[in-house]
Amino acid sequence: MASNFDGIINPGVASRIADLARSYQSAEPFRHIVIDDFLNEQFAGALLSQFPAFEKGNNLGDDGAPGRKSTFERISRLGEAYQALDRFIQAKEFLEFIGEITGIDGLLYDPFYLGGGTHENRSGQALHAHVDFNYHPSEGWHRRLNLIVYLNQGWGEDWGGNLELYRDPYQDPQPAVKISPLFNRCVLFDTTEKSWHAFDPITLPAEAANLTRKSIALYFYSRHRPAEEVAGKHTTHYVNRQIPDHIKAGHTLAPSDVALLRDMIADRDGLLQRLYAENSELRQAQDRGLSGKLIYLLKRYFVRFRK
């Protein structure tokens, strides 16, 4: 493997491309792979130590108030480790490396990190099942791959925050695969109209209440994609979490069930409020004429594509 990999990718990972490619191609419910100890251990540690403070990132919700999620897109503005990562993932050698694993040629790096970069989530946060936006907003490239590296040392099995992969959340509300967000674990998967993914609620115990779920999200594109995968341009498409199978007629609700149902109702209420607010803004923009419409559309575009 090229010297460009030295000190960043674990040599044991870089030396088994053929095995990784076979695993990737055969994975269900859609093509993906989990690679433990993905990065050089010291480099992964440097990324964690230089991870931006929660308050430094974009931590405002759609309502404009601080939330339980913070993202920082322009990672090249962070410490030396992030600058090295930024240089590395745009190099031809790395793009060809993940291209060999996934079978996708001509992969492109996103210099804007739209929707990507560092992601940090506090206890109580979850992410509903969704498929991602499918075209780069400014370049028009096809979005092809998600690569996530987790930076959570000592993460407990029952702390939630597990990446969930679905066949179809409309038909089956239970994930087909659950992946713990363990330190230096990489998850690489296709971005298609069928790559439904989420993470379940983070439930940190009192002794770990100061911790957060940390990850780095990298997205890759191409100028073309197979005709059978091409779809109309859309933003991120969410499906609200469904009622778990164990909650049915005759079931006695546990405190955790009640908390879950309250969160689900709050999520739906929040969605309705956002839709009503968006509709109201659109009507007001229409009343203001062309300039008002343009300002409204730009605001909505920003909110939807930063997710």
Model-derived features: where do they sit?
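Active-site rim elements
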Residues: 33, 75, 80-88, 132-137, ...
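Non-heme Fe(II) oxygenase catalytic core, chiefly the N-lobe of the double-stranded beta-helix
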Residues: 49-52, 86-143, 152-154
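Low-complexity, charge- and small-residue-enriched intrinsically disordered regions
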Residues: 299-307
